[in-house]
């Protein structure tokens, strides 16, 4: 099961699964998921694609129900949305959608699938967090907040499942800025970070996928992101917030 599989990291994760012979159940809120599914089928695996909004319980239930009668060996929970700009200037419907996609829908799906895995006594879960969770996200406050939650949640869930001797592993992939549709959809194309050089989603996906197969607890993709998280752990939050604001403030990009 792969969420957010129509493009970016999720698409590349699904490709890796297909290359290894996994049959796929993929979902995205973008109609491009159907075209993506055709690409996955080129690897000779069975692919079932759904378009659904995982910000809603109905969307999550639709995806979960489609998996009934199948053994789910791995859940790759990658779906997520960003949102740039000052918090007070954002439409709260947009704010709520980011929270409901990145947090509520994600953990609702994980709970449902992980219960089945625990009952069966095996399974692998890969959750896409972010290095953004280490930094107060000035001008992307809600998004960074959701990723701080997801990073923390992933570590805690892994510890719970280990304590229960469940044989279900949880891996948190924490990428940095990646060359996807994220910044366009988040309205951050005019920012310094939106216009910066980004990581290749195929490279990011490979790091996370291999970590999942190896049962690793967490992995930061890319050397510069590893350095950033190390520095962030010893830097005052106020300093981090100021630094983030300089990169994410609307109009901060060099093309403006």
Per-range role (PLM):
Residues 6-7:
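Conserved glycine-rich cofactor-binding loop
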Residues 20-35:
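Conserved glycine-rich Rossmann-like NAD(P)H-binding loop of the short-chain dehydrogenase/reductase
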Residues 78-83:
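Conserved NAD(P)H cofactor-binding loop of Rossmann-fold oxidoreductase domains
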Residues 86-87, 91-99:
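Substrate-binding pocket helix/loop in short-chain dehydrogenase/reductase
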Residues 110, 146:
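Active-site helix of classical SDR
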Residues 130:
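Residue(s) in the substrate-gating loop at a strand-loop-helix junction
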Residues 172, 192-229:
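C-terminal helical subdomain
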